[in-house]
Design a protein with these regions (language model features):
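RNA substrate-binding interface of SAM-dependent RNA methyltransferases
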Residues: 27-28, 37-38, 42-43, 52
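Short, well-ordered beta-strand core segments
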Residues: 2, 66, 92-94
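Short, well-ordered alpha-helix to beta-strand connector turns
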Residues: 30, 64, 89-91
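Histidine-anchored nucleotide/phosphate-binding helix
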Residues: 15-35
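Short internal beta-strands
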Residues: 33-39, 66-71
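A glycine-rich helix N-cap at a beta->alpha junction
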Residues: 49-76
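C-terminal structural segments of small proteins and small subunits
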Residues: 77-96
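Short, glycine-rich nucleotide/cofactor-binding loops
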Residues: 3-18, 40-46
Length: 96
């Protein structure tokens, strides 16, 4: 499984979009992929679950990409999980 970690701020730049697109492209190629949100991206989603970053992240549902975070957020498709365990399961980790 490839783990895409999205931690960049959706307010400052669009690097997070590249992370989401990478996850969607991998899923479209039928490669097992999951997304972990943390850092500035997680802070933004926690403060405003309707922000542009959260809406774009919602595309992961269409490709059945699992989305995780360290803490509970107000998005039904994001699951809170122990991130250390998730990172151990990944064969590759890519950070955006």
């Amino acid at each position: 499984m490839i783990l895409i970690v999205i931690s960049s701020s959706p307010v400052i730049d669009n690097l997070y979009e590249q992370g989401i697109e990478t996850a969607l492209n991998l899923a479209d190629a039928e490669i097992e992929v999951s997304v972990l949100i943390e850092g500035e991206f997680l802070n933004c989603v926690e403060e405003n679950p309707q922000c542009t970053g959260a809406k774009k992240l919602g595309q992961c549902k269409l490709y059945e990409v699992s989305v995780y975070s360290q803490s509970k957020v107000d998005l039904p498709f994001v699951k809170a999980i122990d991130t250390a365990n998730l990172q151990q399961q990944a064969s590759k980790i890519v950070v955006f």
